[in-house]
């Protein structure tokens, strides 16, 4: 779906996150303080792009909304966008022919110790563009606490109850990111881009002190965690318009991740382990496109190779060496037949996996069909079907065994196989200049996915792992409406629906239905912008766990003055005891009910100050067509 932001929306925004918030995109939540975009429906991650390039927080904060031409919102992305991606937001901007842009963006919470800031610069001369950004972020909190009730059915049939309640916590983290990019563009005929990025993060000396009621015993236990990691990334991209109808695109990304973690927990008895993790990956893709009449044909090849070495030392002793190789070839034809727009594609993927003495080969046929019919002006009916493979997270395929508490263990399963997902989406939409509406039905069928599996040992220890089981299905139905009550001045948007989960394990069946709603209102009053947003969170059931991610509400007021913008936001209003999450495990031998509170996120007031100075003329930017990324360190926790 293509979206063209209005002048009022551009003028009232100061970065990429801000303009996305003004658009009120269905199923997306914008976090002001953490500068993050998440999917409310819990279907997967949200991938952000600028001119086709996968971007992070730094690029989104440096983006000038006045340069935005259009936004492509993809709610059913294919496998080429990456694993676990539920939504893609691609922001297309103009680029300066000459001149520069410099700026800064600072956000701080006035009620908690949390904030981030960045500086950035961009210089253009002729066909070349250089950009550099640097950012820091961090937080320190003692407000996050959880309460847990666990009931264990022992081998003799008796029940054993343990309560675990936090009485004191400290969570803190610090991060730094830097990125240098060079882009050479000969109009839109040839594009070359090279970027080098690096990130550092530390979460030192975090701890939780818990009050333990273990049968007749009452004592306190302490958990401590210390994490640090760094990761350089090199990204090379090339695009060539061979002829007016033919183009060639290539992308290669090399990533290295180094992670060191240390964990300690003394519930029952002391348990301590360290992990030294190293990951190296290469992701490549080549696409050829030929725009014929009356259709366009594209073919491509995607190859990835990843090596992971995680050395577990201490009480969790294990050395895992994992090699993942994946090859995916695909072809697609798209065009128009009268009022019918179509895209027909097929592909095949091959996965080769080894870990120590474990290995497998896996083939998948991957068809995709997309049809859209214009019934009348503004009224459209569309349908999409696709099949793809789904590979388990590297961490859960590790052969490491880690103790969770005095009664529970988490064990990886190196024999997990990929699953096959089939997705159907049917949508009826109607749009005018002031009204945008649609009704959407989405059904996903996961064949032999990895699902939660718990078993009790003879000495009454409870082991959690994952194995390939029967099936998981999900049905998501919603209706959306956005309307300009006063054009360019006052806009409202609402959406809501139901989410139905079906879990068919080898020895359990769990069904669950939840309802959701989202609403927003935005007023553009000259240099002032006022916005309110609310949702009721996300409720779901996966495997044997029923979960809830907290609701969110926020009021924001912003003021623009020349090259400056000042914003004040109040999140989770009148909720001083904010429930961040809730989880209920419904295994036949193990019942657990956990509630997590984050008082710092309730009644949270934050301020944002941004400054941007731009000089130079603009032209249409060449768009980066493919993107690759890797952030998985493969450590089990």
Region annotations inferred by a language model:
Residues 1-208, 223-254, 289-295, 370-374, ...:
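Membrane-proximal, glycine/serine-rich, low-complexity loop/turn segments characteristic
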Residues 73-74, 100-104, 158-166, 214-222, ...:
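Extracytoplasmic loops and strand-loop junctions of Gram-negative outer membrane beta-barrel proteins
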Residues 469-486, 499-503, 511-524, 531-553, ...:
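Outer/extracellular conduits and scaffolds centered on Gram-negative outer-membrane beta-barrels
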Residues 143-157, 204-215, 219, 234, ...:
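Outer-membrane beta-barrel translocator domains and adjoining extracellular loop/strand segments
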Residues 197, 251-255, 261-265, 272-278, ...:
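C-terminal low-complexity, acidic/polar tails when present
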Residues 175-203, 224-367, 374-378, 435-443, ...:
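Face-selective signature of the C-terminal outer-membrane beta-barrel domain
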Residues 281-283, 328, 413, 417, ...:
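Outer membrane beta-barrel strand-and-loop segments of large Gram-negative receptors
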